Amino acid sequence: MLSVVEYAVHQLGVKHIIVCGHYGCGGIRAAVSGRSFGLIDHWLQPIRDLARSQFDCRECWSEPELDRLCEDSVAAQVERLARTPTLQAAWGSGKEVSIHGWIYGLQDGLLSNLGCTVSQGD
């Protein structure tokens, strides 16, 4: 997946990367379920770690809490992407690239900017 970002930034000159999550995410629900899902557990672990650091451990999650975890996960992914060698090299060479975190509401169709943009020098 990072090869796509590298190609977009270094070859195509993409200036904006959007990390977009969505409310009602099955991955978020799976991560907090306490169950193992085999190979995808590797992808769920960062969400589990985030949930543990942001919320008290629990078995029941309210919809607003799950929504907030969706938002927090997007913000964490923006930060993680900003730390990759690909983006660090792009910024180091003077490329103007911004990473934006957005969230999509499946119920209302609204796309919202989470305000967690990272750009060169941030």
Residue ranges of each PLM-predicted region?
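Divalent-metal-activated hydrolytic enzyme cores
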Residues: 1-15, 26-122
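Conserved functional hotspot residues or short segments at active or partner-binding sites
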Residues: 19
